[in-house]
């Protein structure tokens, strides 16, 4: 789960639960701000703020981030130092789409190593995630955390590098 840093402490119980259930917990920026409109110094301060919150809740930091709006070039230019996890399948759930529409649009997109983008801001997303996970299992896919996905192929996530997917050690990246 990529979580907005400033929301971690107010929702510490959810952060702890996600971690306890084996999910990866990582950064989705401190404020969900547009990195193109934030100073480089402020961007570089985000990892410490996010990691302080994570350490106070689950005892461990993160080393990666999903940049709001996908504007990772600003983060790389500022040399923030995280690995950036983007996505290869976008559900557009944030638009309020129904589960059936999301499934019909995404089913044909899935391939091994994909990273799926979903949000927690819409009431329908948990149900969509459940339906999607069940369908993916039926198709023979295995769901992995980001760490598991890259570790299975021996890929080390590098700072200031963007990752979109990983399959058999082949990553789609940008530096």
Range-by-range predicted roles:
Residues 10-13, 42-45, 49, 53, ...:
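Extracytoplasmic/secreted proteins, especially bacterial periplasmic and envelope-associated proteins
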Residues 15-18, 77, 109, 136:
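Generic structural signal for hydrophobic
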Residues 1-56, 60-61, 151:
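Active-site beta->alpha N-cap acidic-glycine motif
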Residues 1-3, 24-29, 63-67, 83-88, ...:
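Structural recognition of the beta-strand scaffold that forms the well-ordered cores
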Residues 8-9, 124-175:
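C-terminal domain-boundary segment and adjacent tail
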């Amino acid at each position: 789960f990529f979580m907005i840093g400033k929301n971690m402490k107010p929702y510490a119980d959810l952060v702890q639960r996600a971690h306890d259930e084996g999910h990866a917990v990582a950064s989705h920026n401190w404020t969900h701000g547009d990195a193109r409109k934030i100073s480089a110094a402020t961007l570089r301060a985000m990892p410490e703020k996010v990691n302080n919150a994570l350490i106070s809740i689950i005892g461990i930091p993160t080393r990666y981030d999903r940049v709001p709006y996908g504007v990772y070039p600003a983060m790389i230019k500022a040399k923030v130092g995280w690995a950036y996890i983007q996505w290869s399948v976008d559900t557009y759930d944030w638009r309020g789409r129904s589960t059936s529409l999301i499934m019909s649009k995404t089913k044909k997109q899935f391939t091994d190593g994909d990273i799926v983008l979903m949000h927690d801001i819409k009431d329908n997303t948990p149900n969509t995630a459940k339906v999607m996970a069940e369908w993916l299992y039926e198709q023979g896919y295995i769901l992995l955390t980001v760490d598991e996905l890259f570790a299975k192929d021996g890929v080390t996530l590098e700072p200031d590098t963007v990752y979109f997917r990983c399959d058999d050690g082949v990553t789609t990246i940008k530096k």
